[in-house]
Amino acid sequence: MSSEKDIKSTCSKFSLSVVAAILASVSGLASCVDLHAGGQSVNELVYVGPQAVLLLDQIRDLFVGSKDSQAEGQYRLIVGDPSSFQEKDADTLPGKVEQSTLFSVTNPVVFQGVDQQDQVSSQGLICSFTSSNLDSPRDGESFLGIAFVGDSSKAGITLTDVKASLSGAALYSTEDLIFEKIKGGLEFASCSSLEQGGACAAQSILIHDCQGLQVKHCTTAVNAEGSSANDHLGFGGGAFFVTGSLSGEKSLYMPAGDMVVANCDGAISFEGNSANFANGGAIAASGKVLFVANDKKTSFIENRALSGGAIAASSDIAFQNCAELVFKGNCAIGTEDKGSLGGGAISSLGTVLLQGNHGITCDKNESASQGGAIFGKNCQISDNEGPVVFRDSTACLGGGAIAAQEIVSIQNNQAGISFEGGKASFGGGIACGSFSSAGGASVLGTIDISKNLGAISFSRTLCTTSDLGQMEYQGGGALFGENISLSENAGVLTFKDNIVKTFASNGKILGGGAILATGKVEITNNSEGISFTGNARAPQALPTQEEFPLFSKKEGRPLSSGYSGGGAILGREVAILHNAAVVFEQNRLQCSEEEATLLGCCGGGAVHGMDSTSIVGNSSVRFGNNYAMGQGVSGGALLSKTVQLAGNGSVDFSRNIASLGGGALQASEGNCELVDNGYVLFRDNRGRVYGGAISCLRGDVVISGNKGRVEFKDNIATRLYVEETVEKVEEVEPAPEQKDNNELSFLGRAEQSFITAANQALFASEDGDLSPESSISSEELAKRRECAGGAIFAKRVRIVDNQEAVVFSNNFSDIYGGAIFTGSLREEDKLDGQIPEVLISGNAGDVVFSGNSSKRDEHLPHTGGGAICTQNLTISQNTGNVLFYNNVACSGGAVRIEDHGNVLLEAFGGDIVFKGNSSFRAQGSDAIYFAGKESHITALNATEGHAIVFHDALVFENLEERKSAEVLLINSRENPGYTGSIRFLEAESKVPQCIHVQQGSLELLNGATLCSYGFKQDAGAKLVLAAGAKLKILDSGTPVQQGHAISKPEAEIESSSEPEGAHSLWIAKNAQTTVPMVDIHTISVDLASFSSSQQEGTVEAPQVIVPGGSYVRSGELNLELVNTTGTGYENHALLKNEAKVPLMSFVASGDEASAEISNLSVSDLQIHVVTPEIEEDTYGHMGDWSEAKIQDGTLVISWNPTGYRLDPQKAGALVFNALWEEGAVLSALKNARFAHNLTAQRMEFDYSTNVWGFAFGGFRTLSAENLVAIDGYKGAYGGASAGVDIQLMEDFVLGVSGAAFLGKMDSQKFDAEVSRKGVVGSVYTGFLAGSWFFKGQYSLGETQNDMKTRYGVLGESSASWTSRGVLADALVEYRSLVGPVRPTFYALHFNPYVEVSYASMKFPGFTEQGREARSFEDASLTNITIPLGMKFELAFIKGQFSEVNSLGISYAWEAYRKVEGGAVQLLEAGFDWEGAPMDLPRQELRVALENNTEWSSYFSTVLGLTAFCGGFTSTDSKLGYEANTGLRLIF
C-alpha cells in the first residue's frame, strides 16, 4: 500500500455532468445516460497525446512490466505488438498521459492466466494511481479513476486467473472504478491477491446497466485476524474491495468506500469467493454496498470470510428493487474471541436493507460467531414482492439467520416469510442486541415484524448452548431481543418445532422455545391465525468446573431471581391482543433439577410472562397438549405473575400438564382474570400440587362477565406420577435417534400416570374400608398434604356476572378441593388480612359443580371438599341456578369449609341445590362439611319462587355450639323479597347454631332431620314438615361428640320470656329458664308426603324433638295441613279409603330412649288444625276431615272419602283424538289420488300404465272455546306414497298404492304427546263416460302410537298401541265445458261433484306404564260424510305438453257419527269413566289448488295444496292444511 503513494497522477478528461448523472443517487441510477469523454460521444473517440485508450480490435498481446521500473505516470496496460518493445529502453514506451483512463469496450475482452504474485510489488492488471500530494486543487477535475463503457451488445469483459501480490489483481484504482453498459457481461474468475480485493480494488466501484456479473473463486490472502472488526469491517474482499483510504480525502462524485451494482439486466453471481483471513468473502467495503434495480437473479453462493461470508461493509448494505436474491452456503468462519462479528452472508456496521425485491432466499449460510446469514447494526426487510426465505442458517452464537445490534424490522412484505431450520446458541432465527459472552452486560434490541401480507413462519430453529455463549440470557429458539412485536400482519403466523436446549446459569433468563424477550412480547392485530406448535425448551447437562470456571463450586450457587421456561414464549410482558385465532399446541418445557435450584421461577410449557401476560380481544384462543415438567415447574401452558384472558371469542385450555402447579396456567404473584370472553373451556389439564387447571398462589382467580359457557372439565391435581417420571428420565439416556420420539411420547406417558394416580383410591367401598397401608413418615405425610384444587387453586375465587352457564365437572384432587381450593397449604404462604373465599354472584346462567372429587387418604382424614374447599363461601344475586351434583370427598362431598369460615347462601333468581354429594367421613350424604369449632352458617336466603335445597346433609366436625357466631338466619328481614324456601330432604343435618326463620319457609321433606340448638319462627314465616321429618333441638348438656361437653348458650332466641297470651309453642329447657329453645307459632304439614304407592305400613308423623325434661308453657300452635304441590288429594294410597293421619308428634329425647313430653304439658297446648280446602279446581279424592286429637303424644286427624274428581289431563282425550288423526291421513291420501291419478288428463293415453309416487304432508289444529271440556290437539304428519295403475279399457283405470308416514300429536292444554308411524294400502278406480266421471277407492291403514304423559310432581306415564282405519269413497263428477279460450289450445271446465265417504277407526284396549297409569278399553269411531263441491279447470294443450290447473271448493256434511267403547280407569285411584274424542263440528269447508302437468307422453308432475276449516260457523275449532307433490311415469 505504501508504494502506491509514490505513483504520480495520471488523468484524462471525463465529463463531470455524465458521472454526476450516473452516480447522483441510488434511485437515479436506473435512468443514467451514456458516458462521454471531452464532451464527445464515446462512439466518437478522441485521442489526446499518447494512446492510452484501449483499442480492443488492435490488441494482440499485453506488455506487463514491473511497477517499480515504471516512471511516474506510466501505465500497467500498454497497447501494441510485444515485438515492438523487445530490446527497447523504457523511455521508448508510450509517454506520460496527462489525464486518467477511459476505456471504450466494443468487443469481448478476455484476460486469462496472468500471474504476478511472484513480483513483490505487482499491482492490478489495469491500474490507475493518483498522487496524494497534488499542488493544484482537484475539485474541478471531471473524473478520477478507471471507467469501462460498453459500446455494443458484444461488449464484455472476462478476467480469469489473474493474480497479483498487491490489492486488485485484475483492476486497481486509487480512485473510482466504473463499468457502464457492458452488455456482453462481466466475469471475474479465479483472481487472487495477497492483499485486499482479489479481483478489483478501488476507492469506489460502480457497475451500472451491465448484462450480468459473474464473480467466481476469487480470493484474498490478506490477514485481518486480531484487528477489531468494529474498527474496520470492510477490510478484505475476496473479489471486490472498496475503501476511501487509498488516496486520501477528496471531493467525490461517488462516496469513497461505496460499491454500487445497479440496473443490470443479467444474472449477478458471486460464487466460491473467499477471504479466509479477512472480511467479505466476495465484497468488502469501508462505505456502503448497494445493489439496486437489477432485473435478474442475484446470488451469493459458497463465499467465505471471517465476517461477512459474502459481503462485509463498515456502513450500510442494501438490496433494493432487485429480482430474486439468493444467499446460499456462505460462511463467516471467524470467531468472536478473534474479533469477528459474524454474518454468514452479510455483515455490516450499519443497516442491512432488503427492500422491494422479488424474492429473497438465504439457504445454509453459517457463522462461527453471530448471524448465520446476516449481521448488522440494524436489519430491515421490507416491501419485498416475493417470498422471503431463511433456511438452515447456523450461528455459533446469536442469530441463526439474522443478528442485529439495535433493530430488526420486517415490514410491508407482500408474500410469505419463512425462517426454517436455523441454529444458534440464542435466537435460532433472529437475535437482536449487543451481546457479551465474557460476562459483560448485554444490551438487547427490538424486533418488529409487522404489516406483512403473506404467511410468516418460523420452524425447526434450534438453540443449543454448546458453550456459555452470552451469559445473561439463553434461549429464543426463533426470536431473541428486548422487545419483540408481531403486529398487523395479514397472513398466518406460525412458530413450529422451534427448540431451545440450554443449561442453567445463576441469575439468568433461560428459555423461549420460539421467542425470548427480556422486555415486551407484543402479538397484536394480526388478521389471520397465529399458531405456536411443537416448540420446546429442554435442558442440557451443566458444563463442568474445568470447562467453565464461572461455575466454581467454591463460590456456591444460591437461589436467584432468574427465570426459566416458556416452551414457546418467554418475555417480561407478554401481550397477545386483538388477533384472529391464536393456538399454542404441543409446546413443551423440561427443566433439570439443577436449574430449579439455581433459578427462582421455572415454568410455562407454552408461555412464560415474567411480569404479566395479557391475552385480550382475540377471536379464539387455544392452549392444547402443552406441558412443563421438572422439579418445581409450574404452568403447563402458561406461567406469569399476573394473567389476563379477556374479551376473546373463545378460550380453550385442554390437555396441558405441569409437574408442580397450574396444569393449564399459573399466576404466581397476582390475579388470574377470565373476563368478558365467549366460550371458555379448561379440560383434561394436569397439575401435581397447585391447581389441575389454574393456580394463583397469591392472588384471585376472577371468572367474570363471560358471554359464553365456561367449563372446567376432567382436570386433575395429583402427585404420584412425578416420582415415576423423574426416575425414568434419570435412569435412561436415549440414543440420539430416539430423542425426538421420546419427546413426542412423553406427554402421553405423563398424562397416563396422572390418570392412574387419580383413580387408585377414589372408589372405596361404602363401609369405608381400605386395604391396610404401612405407616408413613411425617415428611411423607406433609408432602401428601400438599395437593389441592383439581381445577383451581387460589387465595380467592370470584365467579361473577357471567351470562351463560359455568360448569365444573369431573375434576379431581388428591387432597383438597376436587374443583376449587382457596387458601394456603403451608403456614408460610398465608397472607395477612386475606381470607380465603369463594364468591359466586350475579351469574345469569347456571353454575354447576358435578362429579368432582378428592381422594380419600386414611392418613389424612381432615381433608376434602369434593367440589370446593375454602374458608368463606358466598353464593348470592345469581339469576341462574347453582347446583352441586354427585361430588365426593373424604369430607365435604360438595363443599368443605375450614375453621373460622362461614357460609352465606342466597337463592336470588334461581335455586341452589345440593344433591347426590357424599363423603367417606360422613359415610354417605354430605353437602357442606364445617371443619373446626368456629365455622358456621351466616344466613340462608331465598327469594319468592326460588329455593335452597339440601338433599344432602350439613355436617359439622365439632357440634359445640357456635357461641361467637350469630344466629343462623333463614330468609333475613334485611330484604323483604326473601320469601322463598329453604328445603331439607332425606338427610340428617346437625347445625350447632340457633335457627331463626324470619320470612318465607323452612321445609323438612322426605324424612329429613334438622338439628339445632334453638329454633324461632317469626310471624308470617312458615315451617313445613313432611311425613317422617324431624325438627330436633340438641341438648346443650349432653355430649354429642367424643371429648366435647356441650354447654347451653345464653341468648339464642330474641325473646327472653313468653308474654301472656302469646300465640306460639314456647319450649324451654326447664321451668326456670326464661330463654326458649323452641318458639314456633305455625307448622305446615304436607298432605302429599304421607303416603305413596311404594309405602306400606304405618305412616310416620312429623316430629318435633326436644331434650328430655324440657318445659312446655301454655301457648297456641297453628297446624296447617297443606297441599304444597296442588296434588295432595291425588295421594291415592292415603286418601282412597278411610284413614287416620298422624299430623304431628312431640317427643322428648333422653339418654336412654326417646319419651313423650308430659301429657299435662301437651294437653295444655291449643293446637288449631286447618285442612286444605277443596275448591273448584282441586282434583283428586274428595272427602271430609274430622277434628284433630292428640293420641299418645301424636296429633291425629281422620279422613272419610266421599268420591273422586278427575283431573282433565287424565281424561285421555289425546288417545281418542288419535282416531280423528287416523282418518285424516287416510282422507289426505284419498284426496291426492282423486286429484292426480283419476283425471281426464290421465285418460288421454288409451291402455297406458302409470307408475307414480308423491310426498304428502299435513298439519291440523283442533281447538275452540266451546270444545274446552275435551282437550284439543295439534297434529302433523308427513310421508310418501307410490302406486301403479293401468287403463284396462278405454277411459277405465284400475290402480293400487301403498304409503308410509310419520306423525306427531301434541295436547294443546297438557304435557302429553303421541308419536305415530304407520302404513296405508289402497285400491282405486275411475271411469269416464262422456261428461260423467265416476271415482272410487278403498284404503286400509295401521298405525303404531307411542304416548308419553307428564304430570309434574306426580310423575309420568307411557303407553303404546296399534290403531287401524278403513276409508271407502265414491264420487261422481259432471264435466261441463264452458268453452275454448283464445287461443284455441286453452279450455275451461266447470265440474260439480258429489261424494260419499265412509270411515271407521278403532284401537284395542291397552294399559299405561308408570305413575298415574290408566287402562283404556277398546274404542272405535265411525262416520259417514257427504261432501259437495265444484271444481274449475283451466287446461292448456300443445303437442305432447298438457297442463291442467284447477281450483276446487267443497262443503262436507257429516251425516252419521258413532263412538263405541272408550271406558278408562285410573288404576291407583280405582276410578273409571267414559272417554271420547273431541266433538268436532260436523261441517267442513275446503279449498284446493291443484296442478297436473304432462311434460311429454312419458313424464308428468303433480302438485296440490288444500286448506280446510270447521265449517262456516265454527272455523276456529278446526283448521288445517294438506300438501302433496310428485310425478308420474307413463308407459
UniProtKB/Swiss-Prot annotation:
Keyword Cytoplasm (UniProt): no
Top-level taxon of the source organism: Bacteria
Cell compartment(s), UniProt: Secreted, Cell wall; Cell outer membrane
Any single Pfam family the record assigns to this protein: Chlam_PMP
Gene3D superfamilies with a match to the protein in the record: Autotransporter beta-domain
InterPro entries, per database record: Autotransporte_beta, Autotransporte_beta_dom_sf, Polymorphic_membr_middle, POMP_repeat
Keywords per UniProt: Cell outer membrane, Cell wall, Membrane, Secreted, Signal, Transmembrane, Transmembrane beta strand
Record domain Autotransporter: where: 1244-1531
Membrane topology of the entry: Peripheral membrane protein
One term under GO cellular component: cell outer membrane
Keyword Amino-acid biosynthesis: no
Signal peptide per UniProt: 1-20
Family per record: Belongs to the PMP outer membrane protein family.
The protein's name in its UniProt record: Probable outer membrane protein PmpD
Organism: Chlamydia trachomatis serovar D (strain ATCC VR-885 / DSM 19411 / UW-3/Cx)
Gene of this entry: pmpD
